[in-house]
């Protein structure tokens, strides 16, 4: 993506997010439902959510844009403020603001973010959604979660809910997201910590509970669900993550086409 910096207006990350208008909550739900891919089965199940109402922390794994759609459907009718990276504000900052998103720069300490989170949870009493992996999963497994997450949860003193998606990565893998596959999608929404447990447990214990709840392996799930991916293009792009030849150990000489991945250094193409 070409960015014309002279035309780009600096975004004020210090300002507090707005409370998501009720009409936007409804519209987001309807649009998300209508935009779900035709012919793809999906299911959202809730566990240990009886009586759980905002405010609460919502933590989700992150595999592709469809995560946001499933999240909007799972949390409806409650208002949600999503923590979003600043690159998402490049084209339509007004829309991100209207949705109540909280702007965040990646891999930096941001005191304004803490202030915004407290504003959402304490003043507005809404849902605060974060994707702690901070990126799309490149290989379909859990990324390293920041230790600061437990401190933030401890400080908030609200329940913690985990939204765990399965199938989203297999449907549109990071390395070939332009060609979706016919894979069923399954999302679970689970309360993993009550407000009382957050107060009682240590930061280390909270981090471990969250880590366990957000652990996933898309390929293991595929095997367990007996899912076959038969699209003729299923290997295209795989060389972007499997960049080292397992035979000659040469790096960055892998290539892929159709349902095959091969090493150019060995002349396997």
Where are these regions (language model features)?
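Soluble, non-transmembrane catalytic domains of enzymes that act on hydrophobic metabolites at membranes
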Residues: 1-5
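Helix-enriched interaction subdomains in cytosolic or periplasmic regions
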Residues: 8-30
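Soluble catalytic domains of membrane acyltransferases
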Residues: 21, 25, 36-209, 224-225, ...
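A generic structural signal for well-ordered alpha-helical segments enriched in polar/charged residues
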Residues: 33, 119, 212-216
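Hydrophobic/aromatic-lined pockets within catalytic cores
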Residues: 157, 215, 253
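Short, structured interface segments
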Residues: 206-220
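Charged, glycine-interspersed solvent-exposed loop segments at helix/strand-loop junctions
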Residues: 218-228
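Cys/His-rich short segments
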Residues: 230-269
């Amino acid at each position: 993506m070409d960015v014309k910096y002279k035309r780009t207006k600096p975004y004020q990350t210090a300002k507090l997010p707005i409370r998501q208008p009720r009409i936007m909550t409804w519209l987001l739900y309807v649009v998300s439902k209508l935009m779900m891919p035709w012919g793809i089965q999906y299911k959202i199940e809730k566990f240990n959510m009886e009586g759980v109402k905002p405010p609460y922390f919502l933590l989700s794994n992150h595999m592709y844009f469809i995560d946001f759609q499933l999240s909007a459907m799972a949390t409806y009718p409650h208002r949600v403020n999503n923590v979003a990276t600043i690159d998402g504000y490049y084209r339509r900052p007004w829309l991100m603001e209207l949705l109540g998103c909280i702007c965040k720069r990646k891999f930096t300490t941001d005191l304004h973010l803490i202030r915004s989170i407290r504003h959402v949870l304490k003043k507005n009493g809404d849902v605060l959604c974060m994707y702690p992996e901070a990126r799309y999963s490149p290989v379909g497994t859990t990324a390293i979660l920041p230790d600061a997450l437990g401190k933030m949860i401890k400080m908030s003193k609200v329940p913690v809910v985990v939204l765990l998606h399965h199938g989203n990565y297999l449907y549109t893998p990071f390395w070939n997201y332009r060609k979706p596959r016919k894979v069923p999608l399954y999302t679970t929404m689970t309360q993993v910590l009550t407000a009382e447990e957050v107060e009682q447990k240590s930061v280390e214990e909270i981090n471990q509970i969250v880590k366990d709840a957000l652990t996933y392996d898309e390929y293991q799930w595929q095997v367990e669900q007996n899912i076959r991916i038969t699209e003729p293009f299923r290997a295209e792009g795989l060389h972007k993550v499997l960049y080292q030849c397992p035979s000659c150990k040469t790096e960055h000489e892998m290539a892929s086409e159709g349902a095959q991945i091969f090493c150019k250094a060995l002349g396997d193409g």
